[in-house]
């Protein structure tokens, strides 16, 4: 177990009403300066699907001491691989296991916030899958609590640690394109059940599933196999469709490399919004103010079946084209060589030396930072801001009108109808009282 030391003075003790009206103690954090062979004790929430991949990756260097899943079948499968880990159906009970240093959160988007907040308030380091949350407000809250507790955090956009993405960010930071005029992002993925309707039949809840725990903070609705396992991403309230699923990956390089911050206006197009289900395709257009002034920088996102009419995107497949005064940079998220076009323009230009660190991988960057060795680069401050931008684009699509966006205040002054989507209602007893 990692040696602990009292962290700097934190916010007042948080009360929790979810498990027998217990009160969470003042957090204590893992100490820095650990020996090279000392390992973190890690608890994992959500151990199937993507969660299994994350768990196995962290287990290469650390101890898995606790497993939690609302699906008993998935929990049993994980326990076969990690028989020494204690098993839980309720993450709140898992977090009371005193030897846990860090937590990996792999659950559906709508429970990212409540689990991560509970862990951070106990001083546990957190790795949480992307997008950071299911709403703008939750992503901001997670970033704020991470900053106030001082825990080490990382959002799970794993390609952020790759040499491929970091080289693109370096080129953009160095200004190789000159003044950037536009960013075009494309994702051809279409999620199962997108563009459909909300299920109306009410089959029985499987015996192995704790449906109330699966719902967590969202308003109650009947179980349906379209939601679990795996289909939840396209149903509003649980997930936010294609864009939220892939936006934190594909927009990561230009967001980081161009230091974009918050947009000032967001527009969206696509099929008429369904109040319950995400569409198969959409277009989202952002306008970002520039520090040096002048016309805003435009970032356009296309996903699913929507053809990017009128755009020059040859060579882009699930990636971005950054258009600048000197030419274009083409980056494909899934790999392949980054291109600077036209080739004759850039042939004689000396490209900048690498300036960003190259971690072993995204997980090791986090675990090393938990031990006081280095920092994470997609922490909840960065990952939260990127998630907010993506999720605000989803809001613009759902309300069906442009948003004059105030990112700092998380509101659209011209569209009060957006407020319930920015900060959705939650069932009582799930969010901690801060």
Where are these regions (language model features)?
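Beta-strand-loop-alpha-helix segment that lines the small-molecule cofactor/substrate pocket
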Residues: 113-161, 175, 400
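N-terminal glycine-rich "phosphate-gripper" loop used for MgATP/nucleotide binding
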Residues: 107-110
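N-terminal Rossmann-like dinucleotide-binding module
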Residues: 14-82, 159-162, 254
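N-terminal Rossmann-like NAD(P) cofactor-binding module of classical short-chain dehydrogenase/reductase
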Residues: 103-104
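Conserved SAM-binding strand-loop segment of SAM-dependent methyltransferases
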Residues: 86-90
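Contiguous beta-strand/loop segments that form the cofactor/metal-binding neighborhood of enzyme cores
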Residues: 167, 179, 184-188, 193-240, ...
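N-terminal secretory signal peptides and thylakoid transit peptides that target proteins
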Residues: 1-18
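Residues forming the Rossmann-fold NAD(P)(H) cofactor-binding site
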Residues: 52, 113, 248
């Amino acid at each position: 177990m990692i040696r602990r030391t009292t962290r700097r003075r934190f916010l007042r003790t948080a009360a929790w009403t979810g498990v027998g009206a217990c009160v969470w103690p003042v957090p204590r954090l893992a100490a820095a300066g650990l020996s090279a062979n000392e390992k973190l004790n890690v608890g994992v929430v959500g151990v199937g699907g993507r969660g299994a991949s994350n768990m196995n990756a962290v287990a290469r260097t650390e101890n898995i001491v606790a497993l939690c899943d609302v699906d008993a079948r998935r929990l049993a499968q994980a326990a076969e691989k990690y028989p020494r880990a204690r098993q839980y159906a309720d993450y709140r009970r898992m977090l009371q296991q005193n030897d846990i240093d860090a937590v990996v959160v792999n659950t559906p988007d709508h429970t990212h916030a409540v689990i991560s907040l509970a862990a951070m308030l106990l001083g546990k380091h957190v790795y949480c899958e992307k997008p950071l949350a299911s709403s703008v407000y939750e992503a901001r809250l997670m970033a704020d609590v991470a900053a106030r507790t001082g825990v080490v955090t990382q959002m799970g956009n794993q390609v952020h640690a790759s040499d491929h993405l970091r080289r693109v960010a370096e080129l953009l930071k160095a200004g190789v394109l000159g003044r950037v005029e536009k960013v075009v992002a494309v994702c051809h993925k279409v999620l199962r059940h997108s563009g459909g309707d909300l299920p109306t039949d009410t089959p029985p809840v499987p015996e192995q599933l704790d449906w109330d725990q699966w719902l967590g903070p969202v308003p109650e609705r009947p179980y349906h196999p379209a939601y679990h396992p795996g289909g939840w991403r396209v149903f509003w309230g649980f997930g936010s469709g294609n864009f939220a699923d892939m936006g934190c990956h594909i927009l990561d390089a230009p967001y980081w490399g161009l230091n974009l911050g918050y947009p000032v206006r967001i527009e969206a197009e696509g099929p008429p919004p369904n109040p319950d289900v995400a569409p198969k395709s959409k277009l989202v257009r952002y306008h970002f103010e520039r520090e040096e002034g002048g016309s805003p920088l435009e970032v356009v996102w296309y996903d699913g079946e929507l053809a990017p009419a009128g755009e020059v995107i040859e060579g882009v497949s699930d990636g971005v084209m950054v258009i600048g005064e000197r030419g274009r940079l083409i980056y494909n998220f899934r790999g392949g060589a980054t291109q600077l076009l036209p080739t004759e323009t850039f042939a004689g230009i000396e490209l900048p030396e690498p300036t960003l660190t190259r971690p072993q991988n995204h997980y090791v960057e986090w675990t090393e930072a938990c031990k006081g060795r280095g920092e994470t680069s997609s922490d909840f401050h960065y990952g939260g801001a990127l998630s907010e931008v993506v999720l605000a684009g989803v809001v613009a699509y759902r309300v069906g009108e442009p948003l004059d966006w105030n990112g700092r205040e998380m509101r659209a002054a011209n569209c009060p109808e957006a407020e319930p989507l920015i900060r959705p209602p939650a069932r009582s007893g799930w969010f901690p009282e801060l």
